[in-house]
Every structure is written in C-alpha cells, then in structure tokens.
C-alpha cells in the first residue's frame, strides 16, 4: 500500500480530482497549504506599501492506494496539474504500514481505494 501526496496549484484541483476520479479513485484528502521551492515568493503592493510574500498558497492532496495503482494515479495527477510553468508542484509516494476504516473496521487493502481503471490514451 502507498500514500500518494501531491502539492499542486490551487486552480488545478478540480482538473486533478476529475482525472483521478476517471480512474476510479473514490476518495482523497485535500488540505490548503503554503510553501515555496524554486518559485520562491513574490512581492505584492498593499495600501501603497510593498511587502514580500514568502510562502505561496498550494493544495495538498493525499490518496491511499494499492501498489498496483501508483503509476496510473501519478500519471493522471501529472497530466492534470501541468501548466509548464514554475510552481506546478511535486508528487511524493510513501509506504503505508497499516490502514483502518474506522466505521467498518476494514483493514489495509479493503480500507483504501479500489483498483483503478488503466489509463487509455484519448483517440
């Protein structure tokens, strides 16, 4: 089992959600986060005063899935989040030791998203 964490631009969230939903991913956790990388911050003007914004708003999404689904989900996120500009984001993949669905007591593979549909190239 794996946990896929993606940091993306906020305006790309709907595109990414639709892309992974098309694969059959039926759940994810979304958090509003701030950060910077190569993009750094930027300068803004507010009431005539200039100030530096060091941390930029981003969205983090987490998807728990089986090992077999990882590459398809990464590909879907990468395509949907892509703008070609600095700050598109990053995808991290972590090992999951144990998962429990609180409501039912289901564990591990039964408690995470079902197998995804293979990605088919549009014709």
Show which residues each predicted segment covers.
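Positively charged, small/polar-rich N-terminal and surface patches that mediate targeting and assembly
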Residues: 1-123
